[in-house]
Structure formats: C-alpha cells, structure tokens
Amino acid sequence: MKILFAINQLSEFVGGSLVPVEVAEYLHGMGHDCTIAANHVDEPLAPLVARQGIVVTDEIPALNAFDFDLVWLQNHTAPLLRYEPVDGSRERTLFVFAHLSGLTFHENPGLVFEPLLADVTIANSENLKRHLTQLDVPPDGIVVYPNPAPAGFWRIDPAAEPAQTPTTVQLISNHAPPEIIDALALCSQRGIDTAHIGQAGTYVRVTPEMLGADGAVVSVGKSVQYAVARGIPPYVYDRWGGPGYLTVENFERAASANFSGRCCFRKIDAQQIAEEIVEGFPAACRFLAGLPPGLLRRYRMEPYIEQLLSRIDSAPPNAARLETLIQKAPWLRRERFMALGIRDNFRGHKAGNAKIRQMRRETRKLKRRLQPG
C-alpha cells in the first residue's frame, strides 16, 4: 500500500514529528510505500528518516491525496494537497486527522477539509478527546492514541529487584524549567549519574538503548511511555509542573492529560524534586512492575496501526468525496489560502532562526579573533 503523512515539520526531535515518523517506520518495515511530506524539512530528523528508505519531501502541494491508500494529516496540511482522480488513483483513501495537542492553532481541527474528509480523528489523550468534541468533532470518530511506544522499546525481562536508589537519572526535555535542571545537579552531588537529552543538552533522538535499567527518567509526554515500556519509572515533571512518580492514585489522571504534567500543575522546588526522585524510586519501581498486562497493552503502538489499516476497505469511495469537495470549492479555496499562509510563515520563522544562529556563530568567531594575545 501507499501511505502518506503530511505534517508541519520534519526537522526537530519533537513529539508532533516523532509520532508520525514512528508509524511510518513501522509501516515501511511491513513493506508499505511510505512518504512523509512536511512544510519544513531539515536536519537532524529528516536525514535519519530518509536513510531508512522512507520518501521525504517538502512539496506537499505536488502530491495527490487520491494516489494513496491512507493519508495521515496534521497541522492543517490537508488543504495543501491535490484531490484529483487520475490514472492510478485509489478507489478509496482512508483519511486520518491526528491531533497531538489542543493548545495551539496548529494542533486544532481544520474548518472545511477536515469535517468533509475525516474518517478517523486521533487524539492523544482523553482530555484532548473531550476538547475536540467541544469543537463539534464527532465523538464516535475519535480514537484515543495515547502516544504508544513501538515494539523496540518494550523490554521483555525487566529487572526483578530494583536498586534502592537510581544509578542514573536521565532528563528528556526540550523545555526543562530551572528547578529540574537544579534538581539534576543535586542528584549528581549524591553520586548519581545524570544526563540531559534535549535541545539544551545532548540533542539526539531517544532510542531504547539509552534507557538503561536501574535508572529513572524525568520527562513528560511521549518519553513517559518510552520509560513505561522499558520498565523504568518515569518522574513526570516539566514546565507545567507535574505529579512526580506515577502511583495508583495519580496514574489515570496523569494519563488523561498525556503525562504532560497538566493533570495537576504541581510546582515544587529543586530540593523537593531531587528528594522525591531518590527517595521515591523503590516504590515507583514496584508500582511499575505491578501494572497489569491489559493496561500496558494500551501503550503498544502496533495494534492501533493495524486497526487503521483494517478500515481502509470501508472508507468512502473517492469519487463520492470528489463530488462533495466540488460542492464546497469556494470554502476549500479559502482554507487553502490559510494553509499556505501557515506554511510560509513557519518557513520564514525557521529561516529567521537559522540566520540568527549563523550570526551568533560569526559573532563568537569575531570576538575570539579580536581578543588580545
């Protein structure tokens, strides 16, 4: 099958990009022909994806949606595609609109294309599902896709006897607040190995091998599911605060907010964070080891994707979709202008940031040359 992912950016290691990338990697591994099209394509993520044999392009308007069996859409990219019945087009295409947040315009539902085309609407949490239904997205079409982890993250034989204190504490964050950075330093003073994976630390894609046994992970969102899959207790805290280690009392509430920390907005200081990370570690390990298999299956990625594939044959015919699109043509053109504006503004934003980084590098070089001696 041919499968298309149309997203805003394929450049940074962020959840909005990594979610479709992981789905594409799985489908590509099954032998499907996958394309990821993004408004902005750049290092470091895009080359990693392209090297696997997945097609990468920044020309979304050059693509015909009806050439694909499944189209996964994010960030108001649907209006940028063409919808043309030509030789080789599919009789049916399943349209999946994925929403991974409700905080920004980019992540909220579209106005015309989405209501007309959506066969499946993805929300990454129960809270986001409620938000989408308040915006008149039909609830029976929403699938909660809780940032599940790919098979490679799941460790079959987790350590049976956890250490009394974590041997390592890994912070995974692109936006860690000061109290977390300070807490990491306090853990280091206790003799615990610490590391920061993110834009202010070591900027790499998180892999299963990075998440070793007998350690703790401090993060929110997608990395929490990674940690759960590895059998490593996640300490849920970031810029929104958070509940800390997962417990019987807070698990479902934290999950309903996608482990973002927005379940409680609890903010504490660095000293308390460090104490909780160290002192609460054994109990956090025991809680994680006791999670029932049925609950853990919720966070396995592959069954969700298989369910999507099974729905392709029941998608509406593209001929019927085309008739509906033609009837709404003036409104669709309006939304296309908006989507082009989003694309151009984002590209300009990225180009401006790149220019600023270049100027800073050149300024540092000039200062070094001008230093006496």
Predicted segments, located by residue:
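A short, glycine/small-residue-rich beta-strand->loop->alpha-helix junction that serves as a flexible
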Residues: 7-19, 177-179
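A charged, aromatic-enriched C-terminal amphipathic alpha-helix characteristic of glycosyltransferases
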Residues: 15, 159-160, 263-334
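Short amphipathic alpha-helix
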Residues: 16-27, 44-45, 308
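A short beta-strand/loop micro-motif in the catalytic core of glycosyltransferases
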Residues: 71-72, 117-126, 217-218
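Short His-centered aromatic/hydrophobic patch
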Residues: 73-79, 99
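Acidic anion/phosphate-binding donor-loop and adjacent secondary structure
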Residues: 105-110, 130-134, 143-165, 205
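A conserved, positively charged/aromatic
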Residues: 106-119, 210-211
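Catalytic binding pocket for nucleotide-activated donors in carbohydrate/polymer assembly enzymes
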Residues: 222-287
